Swiss-Prot record:
Keywords: Amino-acid biosynthesis, Branched-chain amino acid biosynthesis, Chloroplast, FAD, Flavoprotein, Magnesium, Metal-binding, Plastid, Thiamine pyrophosphate, Transferase. Transmembrane segments: none annotated. This is Acetolactate synthase large subunit. The gene is ilvB. It comes from Pyropia yezoensis. One of its GO terms (biological process) is L-valine biosynthetic process.
Length: 590
């Protein structure tokens, strides 16, 4: 419960802030102190002493934003981060933008120079309100401490309602210090008419969608992150069980449906499975749930699902029809919409199983002809082999990733549950993985959290090893170390005449094992298959943090790949069907 009961008494703006966020259920804050935010940190001291909230000290404010982001993705709650004014606030920007494009509800609270100094170019003054306007749902500058509790209540409401996203509250230093007669605004007691999602479903659209599903002989569910946010995994499972509709997901939708199921085709798009991309190209009905038809999914847009009618369901009316005009557009919560459609299907539109069986058999032939590929056994290790082995040892783990080849391989080969896949999808933020692992581990202290990173991405935020060491967070860090900016090199090889401009990462590269050990973190270097399995097992079983520097084959490319401007059916690097699999590879199921 809050430090003080709801009484009229003289309190500071800093007290009002902390009291308000605790009333909203916040248990953890990620942040870094500084001059303008010191009044809030000074007040925080008493709240931590009373065990009412815990602050996690990061080593860079970007890490605070990513940790809050991951905390939110894995729990469904609002993640909170603190930073001071000026460079502290601007260091949050990449993290806020990451949360914005992936629809993650985080609350960023920044210090600001005193009210009298705003606009004077004072020391560490930056217009963070203006800077962040394009990447937040809403921004506030608290000009009167009496508004603090209301602003916090509104911020939490805005973060979570409709399409989730970040909100920023900028707090001038003297607002945190000023005393006033404090009354709290209870959580949820807000009135923001312009921030109300559409909740009444239109029966006509539901009826049209149900009819289209029954009449389809080759339907496909295309599921994005909105379905994860909606907690719709159970109702989607019921729909698939009833109508036997195959499922493909975006990077953000990964985990929404059992990835071991025969009906799961994995990820679609640029590095999706061949059979998912063929299914999209051949389906006659595409049911898009919480997905936004972005370019990495669609490839050449006018050839994406070009034989299909489209049902598009999304909580955000701005997304429906933005890139692809649907035959049926439904604005609403994915779980609620699917529930309505399923109820109507069960009562009025029974399935025709012979149609769906034929479609599933066709997909299964693609699955057999064009499997995901893993290099044949050799003394060296490949990224795919490491990921398959890791997944077998830690089937219920939370996985965070950075961005690049290792992210795409992880999406292909790791099989995860909903909210156990934590990755920067829309913005593609290198450096996300390590601080995201901190956020996930803080949120789930008794679960295994594994950060899959690349040697280039890891160096973006490797200072957060200090945070992991300070709090002894038992994060397992697996670095896929190929001595390149791997995805950049792959594109330079494929599209830029093998001119490898500034993508080699050997000179100046750290010894990751020694680096981790300098922070007091157990670490191993893996450079062959003989010690890979045992090192992975030790890392998973060890009660503290562990780093594994996995020195993999250098020139491995991530396939399949859809080249820019090509349709999803035009993939590079898939097995040729007449040979079953490529000569240097084996099916990952072997």
């Amino acid at each position: 419960m809050p430090l003080k009961q709801r009484v009229s008494s003289e309190k500071t703006g800093a007290f009002a802030l902390l009291d308000s966020i605790v009333r909203h259920g916040v248990k953890h804050i990620f942040g870094y102190p500084g001059g303008a935010i010191l009044p809030i940190y000074d007040e925080l001291y008493a709240w931590e002493e009373a065990s009412l909230i815990k602050h996690i000290l990061v080593r860079h404010e970007q890490g605070a934003a990513h940790a809050a982001d991951s905390y939110s993705r894995s729990t469904g709650e609002v993640g909170v981060c603190f930073a001071t004014s000026g460079p502290g606030a601007t260091n949050l920007v990449s993290g806020i933008a990451t949360a914005h494009i992936d629809s993650v509800p985080i609350l960023a609270i920044t210090g600001q120079v005193g009210r009298a100094f705003i606009g004077t170019d004072a020391f560490q003054e930056v217009d963070i309100f203006g800077i962040t306007l394009p990447i937040v749902k809403h921004s506030y500058v608290v000009r009167d401490p009496r508004d603090m509790s209301r602003i916090v209540a509104e911020a939490f409401f805005i973060c979570k309602h409709g399409r989730p996203g970040p909100v920023l509250i900028d707090v001038p230093k003297d607002v945190g210090l000023e005393k006033f007669n404090y009354f709290s605004v209870e959580p949820g007691k807000v009135n923001i008419p312009g921030c109300r999602p559409i909740t009444s479903l239109k029966s006509r659209q539901i009826l049209m969608a149900a009819k289209m599903i029954q009449q389809s002989s080759q339907p496909l569910l295309y599921i994005g992150g909105g379905a994860i946010i909606s907690d719709s995994h159970q109702i989607i499972k019921e729909l698939v069980d009833f109508y036997k509709i195959p499922v493909t997901t975006t990077l953000m939708g990964k985990g929404i449906f059992n990835e071991d199921s025969d009906y799961c085709l994995g990820m679609l798009g640029m590095h999706g499975t061949a059979y998912a991309n063929f299914a999209v190209s051949e389906c006659d009905l595409l049911i898009a749930l919480g997905a936004r038809f972005d370019d990495r999914v669609t490839g050449k847009l006018d050839e994406f699902a070009c034989n299909a009618q489209v049902i598009h369901v999304d909580i955000d009316p701005a997304e429906v029809g933005k890139n692809r005009i649907p035959q049926v557009a439904i604005v609403g919560d994915v779980a609620e919409v699917v529930s309505e459609i399923l109820n109507l299907l069960k009562t009025s539109f029974p399935p025709y199983p012979e149609q769906i069986i034929s479609w599933q058999e066709r997909i299964n032939r693609w699955r057999q002809q064009y499997p995901l590929l893993v290099p044949r056994k050799s003394t060296s290790i490949s990224p795919q082999v490491i990921l398959v082995a890791t997944n077998k040892l830690a089937q219920n783990a939370y996985f965070t990733t950075d961005v690049g080849q290792h992210q795409m391989w992880s999406a292909q080969f790791l099989k995860v549950k909903a909210k156990h896949w934590l990755s920067s999808a829309g913005l593609g933020t290198m450096g996300y993985g390590l601080p995201a692992a901190i956020g996930a581990q803080v949120a789930h202290p008794n679960d295994v959290v594994i950060c899959i990173s690349g040697d280039s991405s890891f160096q973006m935020n490797m200072q957060e090893l200090g945070t992991i060491a300070q709090y002894q967070l038992p994060v397992k860090i697996i670095i896929i170390n190929n001595r390149w900016q791997g995805m950049v090199r792959q594109w330079q090889q494929a599209f830029y005449g093998e001119r490898y401009s500034h993508s080699r990462m050997t000179e100046g590269a750290p010894d990751f094992q020694k680096l981790a050990e300098a922070f007091g973190i157990k670490a191993f270097t893996i450079n062959n298959r003989q010690n890979m399995q045992s090192a992975l097992q030790v890392a998973i079983d060890y009660p503290g943090p562990v780093l594994l520097d996995c020195q993999v084959t250098e020139n491995e490319n991530c396939y399949p790949m859809v080249a820019p401007g090509k349709s999803n059916a035009q993939m590079i690097g898939i097995a040729k069907p007449q040979r079953g699999t490529a000569s240097n590879y084996i099916n990952n199921s072997v």
